[in-house]
């Protein structure tokens, strides 16, 4: 693994190795701390979008591993005033041992990684959110003991979370169902990847069909538009029936896990009652962002 830009960068063995290392680092941290695997290493934390969990978990994770993490808002860099992306990449690659970047276009991230000359980690693009999906899979494995053969259902917008969860779930040997309105389907290349897995993948617009006998149901914010705008009102109409409610989940497994990458819009993609009922696994999922990201850093920078 040279970078982590999208889930399809990983082989099944590499995915399992990341989760195994994350388990080890989490256990060590609970016992008092991890070895300074990143001693003398520097990590640029470059953000073009607002962030709570990604920024703070990377800052804490780099510190816990003995490295130095520098946060930078791209609006405050020369890149925010027109400096070409390729120049920023070639400069930061000479200062830092690794770059984490949260940005909009996946193509920008891919170009940056080609030029930086150091490992680059996707902190979220409009196409992919691999760090979050690694945390999701870690949480499922912790609570269920295995991933292979379990039914994972995603309900919502077929954007970054759906794209990454489909690929990650299939790489882990899960049965994956994606439930989304017809006009909010996942990326074409993701669907092409998924269809190679045959009956292990199912795409539907029917939430009741999708959650049937699911072991895990995941969702994410689907009303990403500014409240009160025409786009927001359109999304509210388009996603009627796609809220995770107690009634919808009645057809899932009795011990179904519910995951949400946060932030949650209660009353939109998930009801308040379902969110609070499943808060323990949702906040384990949030904590595990820290541990899987530490694992990725340790593998990329310390040969773990």
Feature roles, as predicted:
Residues 42-43, 47-95:
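Active-site cofactor/substrate anionic-group-binding motifs, chiefly glycine-
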Residues 65, 95, 115-117, 172, ...:
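Short, structured coil segments at secondary-structure junctions
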